[in-house]
Amino acid sequence: MPKYNLINQKGDFLSQIDLDDEIFGISINKQVLYDVVNAQRASMRQGTHATKNRALVSGGGKKPWRQKGTGRARHGTIRSPLWRGGGVAFGPSPRDYSVKVNQKVRRLALKMALSWKINNKNLILIDNINLETHKTKEFQNILDQLNIQQKTLILTKDLNHNLCLSIRNLSKVLLETVSHVSVYQLLSYSTIILTKEAANYFEENLK
């Protein structure tokens, strides 16, 4: 089992704890990570794009002139894509972009992402985050004490009211619960702050 330093919110060393190899120490398969991230990003798309084709554009039910004898090109409707004000040919229509990924693969990718962060020393294991107020300054002091300046993802077991309010004005910080975090989020942020409770949740639920 890999040993990892547990610190408090001031950055002081508390102890070394054993992390489960099956969660935080597995080998990385980039193809699995790519497939899951690709699916998660695709599911973010609304897919509500739409244009009006010749059937949806208002009007055009009557033939503009008779078929023969006028010397003009033959037309059956003024809403043909060839006409000004006509429908769009082969335009986008609403669709569902979601891609099915098996639950086993999603869980595997989540474990790989955590292992990746552990291997690259981009994960900070903290005992707990306690804030007396909801002021941004108080949480910024914690980031300064931990010497964190890059994009940061905070993973907790449950949402904390003061913590939620204190990070709202920090553009580079995101708070997420372990039950809702995605592989895309784990890989998008440079630093992960993981509480001890959140780590225990992963070990209990990702096996």
From Swiss-Prot:
Residues 63-76 have a biased composition (Basic residues). Gene3D superfamilies: 3.40.1370.10. InterPro entries: Ribosomal_uL4, Ribosomal_uL4-like, Ribosomal_uL4_dom_sf. Keywords: Ribonucleoprotein, Ribosomal protein, RNA-binding, rRNA-binding. Residues 55-76 are annotated as: Disordered. One of its GO terms (molecular function) is rRNA binding. GO terms for biological process: translation. Pfam families: Ribosomal_L4. GO terms for cellular component: ribonucleoprotein complex; ribosome. Part of the 50S ribosomal subunit. Belongs to the universal ribosomal protein uL4 family. One of the primary rRNA binding proteins, this protein initially binds near the 5'-end of the 23S rRNA. It is important during the early stages of 50S assembly. It makes multiple contacts with different domains of the 23S rRNA in the assembled 50S subunit and ribosome. NCBIfam families: rplD_bact. This is Large ribosomal subunit protein uL4. The lineage of its organism: Bacteria, Bacillati, Mycoplasmatota, Mollicutes, Acholeplasmatales.
